[in-house]
């Protein structure tokens, strides 16, 4: 969700975090996890049939799933909504290095991005910064 996903299907349940990482690495070799962040912030979403993708992944990685004793989950698709009043037509990236003081009306939050009327800021990129917020 912190990447701005609008829907998801849980695939597997594993015994621990380490196993989760190992399975994820194998699946990621075939299934890209790249999101065009500018399109995502404009809400220009490419529709994907997650049930078809799920079935392909489970079939292709059946050995990995079996070797790691992962339990295949039979769950529904989850949809996510974000508090956004207005999506930008053009995405202008803001950051505290170039602009130490950012002013403007906050019109939305999507994942790790704060959307202002005049630009967006990836707040995770600025973790550890001390900021002052006035409203």
Language model features by range: what are they?
Residues 1-5:
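Arginine/glycine-rich "motif VI" loop of SF2 helicases in the C-terminal RecA-like domain
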Residues 6-10, 14-15, 21-135:
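Conserved RNA-binding domains used in RNP assembly and mRNA/RNA metabolism
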């Amino acid at each position: 969700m912190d990447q701005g996903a609008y829907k998801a299907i849980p695939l597997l349940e594993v015994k621990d975090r380490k196993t989760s990482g190992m399975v994820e690495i194998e699946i990621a070799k075939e299934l890209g996890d790249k999101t065009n962040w500018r399109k995502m912030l404009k809400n220009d979403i490419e529709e994907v049939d997650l049930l078809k993708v799920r079935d392909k992944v489970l079939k292709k990685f059946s050995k990995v799933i079996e070797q790691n004793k992962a339990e295949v989950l039979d769950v529904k698709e989850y949809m996510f909504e974000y508090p956004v009043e207005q999506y930008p037509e053009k995405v202008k990236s803001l950051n505290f290095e170039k602009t130490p003081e950012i002013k403007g009306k906050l019109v939305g939050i999507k994942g790790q991005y704060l959307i202002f009327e005049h630009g967006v800021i990836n707040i995770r990129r600025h973790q550890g910064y001390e900021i002052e917020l006035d409203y």
